[in-house]
Amino acid sequence: MITIKRGISIIAVVEPMDTVTQEKEVSGGNFINLSFELPYYREFKRMDYAEILGETYYLTQIPTVSKEGKRDYQYTLSMEGEQCKLGRVEFLQSNLIGQYFKNPFFINDKAETFMTLLLRNIERVFPNEGWKLGYVVDSEIKNISFDNQNCLEALSTLAEAFDTEWLIKGRTIHLYRKQSATGLVMKQGEGEALYSLEKKPQDNSNIVTRLYVYGSDKNLPNPYRRGLTRLTVGDLPYIERQIEEYGIWEDSKTFDDIFPMNLGTITSVDSGNILRFTDANFPFDITTQLIPEVKAKLSFQTGQLAGYEFEISSYNHTYKTFTINKNTQDKAWEVPNADIKPEVGDTFFVFDIRMSNAWVTAAEQALRQKAIEYMDQRNDPSENDTYSVVCNPLYFKRTGKTLRIADSVTIEEPDMGILTQKRIVKLSRNVRQPFIYTCELANRPKKNVMVKLLQQL
């Protein structure tokens, strides 16, 4: 029996129908369509809740109810896990004094900074519920824009941008790819865990053996490789792999975050002028690499100014000192200012200049390596195989073992030549008989895509 509550009050005690299942997906849904009958009419409201299979589920939509005969009321309640609360909270930017600003905005930082802002927004609406961060991937710096997203949408944006996944367990939010080996071997046979198995490609995208690959249009010499306007990998703007095996399958890919750059670090700031700072190790004179009629700019990667771009007013290579203009795009919040300013240790890169050949070559090599990784992933059959599995309920009833989303299991099917480890990316569990499972096994959920990385050259 399932007890449905509103606050501390019991609204109804119901017996779920045999077909009711718990549905979970990696970086996705966690819901139950709770169907049941009552001999009387009961009104249910949004955010009524119930404890089901050890988790709290909330009614998020007006329920469906029908009446058959004089006394039989049939209900279906769409209930979601704790993550539904994130969909109620706008993902807003905040400043150092706790003021929140409307979208759009962007941040340039590591995953932990984004997740800290996410948590602050959740606590803004649900201040005393014990929400906290769990594991957060140790990431590169990313520049990510947000426009009218709630916290659940923002969490999915972060998972995609940092090439990882999100997981909410109770009221703890994780941003990482869970890799928990269970030791369970799924195979068919008397007393084994597997009842039926279907193997299929995760998507129908073609392999690629010739990839036309491009980077950003920033910081390129003029002319560049016969008039090309974007970074590429050589005189021929493509990479070939496995053509002898598969023939020619062409595609193209652009990595906008890869371009010739040097990551500078502030070593001192002028105490009398927050617009002036020094990088004692800056390696080249940018005044010799300016583009006619184009203002050189710099973008902060870390620190209070992370994500902001500034025109360079002047540069003195003798002292390796930069002077920048204020960023006045937001008239209500011009930067730098007394609260948000450059500090020693902040990192930045200069753009809208022409970098020397050495930096261009390094960027081309980084682009080539990224393209090879992309092609290898596209062409690896094991990356694209997915398995739909119906589990043997008698096995799980006898052993007491449970399956959890994102856990890894081994699939063994000798006749099909299958012996591989895969993760549970979708999981369906019967509520009345929790030893009945069906699941989908793959390396990654379908919606996870390759994203661009910022390269330090």
Functional labels for PLM-detected ranges:
Residues 22-39, 72-85, 211-213, 377-395, ...:
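Oligomerization/assembly interface segments of phage tail-like spikes and tubes
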Residues 41-130:
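Surface-exposed cap/loop segments at beta↔alpha junctions
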Residues 63-86, 129-220, 299-306, 318-330, ...:
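Short beta-strand-centered interaction patches in the first periplasmic/extracellular domains
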